C-alpha cells in the first residue's frame, strides 16, 4: 500500500483587481497639471520669457514633484474604506504608470536619439549656445526636451558611457510593466512577482548613477550645490525609496494571491 503526499498547486485565479476610478481621477488630474506646467515652460522658453537654464531647471522640479503623486493618492484615499490589497494595488499602479511615462517621455527617446542630437557638447555654455536653434521652429523644441537634464548633469549630453548603459533599463521596465498589466488582466497569481523581481533594478541603477558622479568629484555637475542636489538626490531618491516600499507591498500581495489560488491535491 502506498500513500500519496499532498501537494499544492496554484490553479485558481487570483482576486480581480483594477485601478479604481477615484485613484485614476487623482492620477489623471495630477498628470494633466504636470503636463500643462511643462508645456507652459516650453512656450515661455520659446517666446523668450525664460532662458534655457531656468526653464529646464523648473521642468526638473516639476517632474520630481509629480513622481510623488502616489503619496497624494495614499493621503486622499487612505480612509476611503477600500480593501487593503486593492488600495495597495492602486498605489502600485500609480507609481508604475509614473515610471513608465518617464521612460516613454524622456529616457527611451534620449537613449535612441541623444548620440545623434548632441554633437560636441561638453559644457553648459555649449548647450545654452543651442538656444537660437531651439527657437527657430516649434519642431526644434525636441532639443529642449532631450537637453533639459543637461542643465543639471552633463552626462546626458556628452555621451557618458555609464549613463547610457544605465538607461538601457528603461526598455526592461517598459516591457515588464506592460506584462504586469497583462498578467493582472488574466488574474495570474504571479503578477506581483514581476514587481518583486524588478524592484532591485532601479535601486542598483540609481546608486550607480549618483555615486559614479560623486566618485568623479562632480565633474559633470555644471550648476551650484542646489542644482547638484536636484540632479543626484531630489530627482533620484524616488528610484531608491519607492521601489523598496513597493517591493515590500508587492511581496505581501503576491503571498495573498498565492494563498487565494492554492489548491490542495491529495
PLM feature spans:
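Membrane-lumen (extracellular) interface motif
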Residues: 40-61, 75-88, 184-192, 211-231, ...
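Aromatic-anchored segments of alpha-helical transmembrane domains
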Residues: 34-42, 100-105, 200-210
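Transmembrane alpha-helices of multi-pass eukaryotic membrane proteins
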Residues: 21-33, 53-66, 86-99, 162-166, ...
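Hydrophobic cores of alpha-helical transmembrane segments in multi-pass inner/ER membrane proteins
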Residues: 61-74, 176, 237-250
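Transmembrane alpha-helix/helix-exit interface in multi-pass inner-membrane proteins
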Residues: 100-144
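Helix-loop boundary elements of multi-pass alpha-helical membrane proteins
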Residues: 6-30, 69-98, 180-197, 254-266
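Terminal transmembrane helical module of multi-pass membrane proteins
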Residues: 223-266
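A loop-to-helix transmembrane entry motif
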Residues: 157-173
Amino acid at each position: 500500500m502506498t500513500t500519496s503526499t499532498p501537494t499544492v498547486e496554484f490553479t485558481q485565479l487570483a482576486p480581480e483587481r483594477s485601478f479604481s476610478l477615484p485613484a485614476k481621477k487623482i492620477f489623471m488630474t495630477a498628470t494633466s497639471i504636470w503636463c500643462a506646467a511643462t508645456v507652459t515652460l516650453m512656450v515661455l522658453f520659446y517666446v523668450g520669457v525664460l532662458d534655457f537654464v531656468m526653464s529646464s531647471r523648473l521642468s526638473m522640479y516639476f517632474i520630481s514633484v509629480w513622481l510623488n503623486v502616489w503619496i497624494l493618492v495614499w493621503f486622499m484615499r487612505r480612509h476611503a474604506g477600500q480593501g487593503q490589497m486593492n488600495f495597495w494595488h492602486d498605489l502600485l499602479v500609480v507609481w508604475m504608470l509614473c515610471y513608465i511615462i518617464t521612460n516613454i517621455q524622456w529616457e527611451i527617446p534620449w537613449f535612441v536619439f541623444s548620440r545623434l542630437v548632441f554633437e560636441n557638447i561638453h559644457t553648459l555654455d555649449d548647450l545654452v549656445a543651442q538656444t537660437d536653434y531651439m527657437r527657430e521652429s516649434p519642431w526644434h523644441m525636441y532639443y529642449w526636451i532631450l537637453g533639459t537634464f543637461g542643465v543639471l548633469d552633463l552626462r546626458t549630453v556628452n555621451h557618458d558611457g555609464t549613463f547610457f548603459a544605465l538607461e538601457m533599463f528603461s526598455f526592461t521596465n517598459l516591457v515588464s510593466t506592460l506584462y504586469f498589466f497583462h498578467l493582472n488582466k488574466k488574474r495570474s497569481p504571479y503578477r506581483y512577482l514581476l514587481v518583486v523581481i524588478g524592484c532591485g533594478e532601479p535601486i542598483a541603477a540609481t546608486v550607480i548613477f549618483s555615486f559614479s558622479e560623486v566618485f568623479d568629484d562632480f565633474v559633470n555637475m555644471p550648476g551650484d550645490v542646489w542644482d547638484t542636489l536636484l540632479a543626484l538626490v531630489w530627482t533620484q531618491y524616488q528610484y531608491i525609496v519607492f521601489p523598496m516600499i513597493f517591493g515590500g507591498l508587492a511581496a505581501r500581495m503576491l503571498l495573498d494571491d498565492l494563498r487565494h489560488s492554492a489548491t490542495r491535491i491529495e
